């Protein structure tokens, strides 16, 4: 195999043909909108906003102490970012969740591309973790390594689903690959308040994760990559309690 053929195979994504229901529109004040895609975009944006403001969901509402910290946030995001869109897919859309990335997908390419990404990103993350802004943000005590992995796996896999699963695949079937850029907007919005270099890096990192989900048809590989990057950052910044 040549380099060109390997590249062509690695970047050849599957087709995402819309179903009859995907193609249905709704007219609002004379404006014709794609019903599912518009609903997914509005809901995903509203859920991110609720998470950022914590307007409706508080630790107390979840039965957790007010100082529950990262675990409270992870449980909240599981509810907002996983349970709510899953319920919408099943109950409102009456659709198969596998069409929205809840499957293994093309696992050979997913695993291979994930490993390649890990090799590239590991030295970059370790280098960034030594910077004062990153050490101040990620070096705060975050718990033991198993606690950190469990907490951020719950949180980040849920976040992957709402943006690069539910939203991405709903948009893909109506607006095509432009969806990979549209999902960047709420993703970047959710990172406001983090170190500035990380905020700008989400333009690249988020696009790569969206592309990976498009290529594999799954949120699994981007989710695992996201968890690895964040846990490595916390470890390298000194946030793990021994």
What annotation goes with each model-predicted range?
Residues 158-182, 211-218:
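Membrane-interface helix/loop boundary segments of multi-pass membrane proteins
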């Amino acid at each position: 195999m040549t380099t060109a053929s390997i590249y062509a195979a690695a970047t050849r994504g599957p087709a995402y043909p819309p179903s009859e229901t995907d193609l249905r529109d709704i007219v609002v004040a004379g404006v014709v909108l794609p019903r599912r895609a518009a609903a997914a975009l509005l809901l995903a944006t509203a859920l991110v906003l609720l998470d950022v403001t914590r307007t409706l969901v508080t630790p107390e509402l979840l039965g957790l102490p007010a100082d529950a910290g990262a675990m409270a946030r992870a449980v909240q995001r599981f509810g907002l970012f996983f349970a709510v869109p899953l319920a919408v897919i099943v109950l409102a859309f009456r659709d198969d969740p596998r069409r929205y990335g809840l499957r293994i997908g093309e696992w050979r390419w997913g695993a291979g591309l994930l490993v390649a990404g890990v090799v590239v990103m590991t030295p970059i993350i370790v280098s960034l973790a030594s910077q004062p802004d990153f050490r101040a943000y990620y070096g705060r005590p975050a718990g033991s390594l198993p606690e950190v992995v469990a907490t951020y796996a719950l949180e980040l896999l849920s976040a992957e689903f709402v943006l690069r699963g539910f939203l991405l695949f709903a948009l893909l079937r109506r607006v095509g690959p432009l969806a990979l850029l549209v999902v960047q907007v709420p993703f970047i919005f959710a990172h406001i308040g983090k170190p500035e270099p990380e905020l700008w890096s989400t333009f690249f990192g988020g696009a790569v994760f969206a592309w990976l989900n498009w290529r594999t048809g799954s949120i699994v590989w981007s989710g695992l990559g996201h968890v690895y990057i964040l846990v490595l950052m916390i470890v390298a910044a000194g946030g793990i309690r021994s």
